[in-house]
Amino acid sequence: SLPKAINALDVNGWEDAALGILTTDTRPKGASVQFQHLGRSISLSGIAKGSGMIRPNMATMLAFVASDVKCTPTLAQDLLNQAVNQSFNRITVDGDMSTNDSCMLIATGASDLCLDEDTDLVALFSHALTELMQELAHAIVRDGEGATKFISIEVLGGASSEECLQVAYAIAHSPLIKTAMFASDPNWGRILAAVGYAGVPNLDVNSLTIHIGDCLLVEHGGCAQSYSEAAGQEIMNKDEINIRVDLKRGDTKETVWTTDLSYDYVKINADYRS
């Protein structure tokens, strides 16, 4: 297979490569971004694979990103780590993982622009790399096994990044919440329960608020007085749902992206044989 792959190398072979790494994915995932610096155009392109077993630490996910800049391995690794932590390490489909994952950043050096010699270029490149990887990460979630909804979970007002992520992942990994999302059920009790058992020390559930979209769902430890089932249902019927939890105990915020849990998820994984 390797000689055949080598002979098939082509500068326009991104889609073939993206197709070649799929497993339970239903479609290839690729993205490109460009930005300008000193009158020059810098390009980044990437492909990714993943549909289930995505978190933690990327699990069965694969991602390959290339850019035409020059860069030392040390700086490239630092930039990659930063971008991964705000993209691929902020998504989850089922909370499951495996021993197989890779994410690579390749600096081809086709351009004479060198990241190590220009701090302004480093900042621009870091932003573009994170943007590209978030686009690929979101594509993985949208193609999650059996997924029918793309769910953003934003936790703000935290005392630390760690506790914001604790709450976000407690919500994202709850089978009861994920099945409620599949049913378009604005079940505030399940969300509040997950926030409560996330393990945040000295959390005051009477102070926090929970929104779905722009609709206030929870305040004062229970269902908000202003909440109406019709408003909640209208939001839940959408394909994209935003859950926002304000812990009201600090200035930190984090966002995690996930899916609902459908009948098809069970079918895909019951039928799959490796």
Per-segment meaning from a language model:
Residues 1-274:
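A structural signal for small-residue-enriched, beta-sheet-centric alpha/beta enzyme cores
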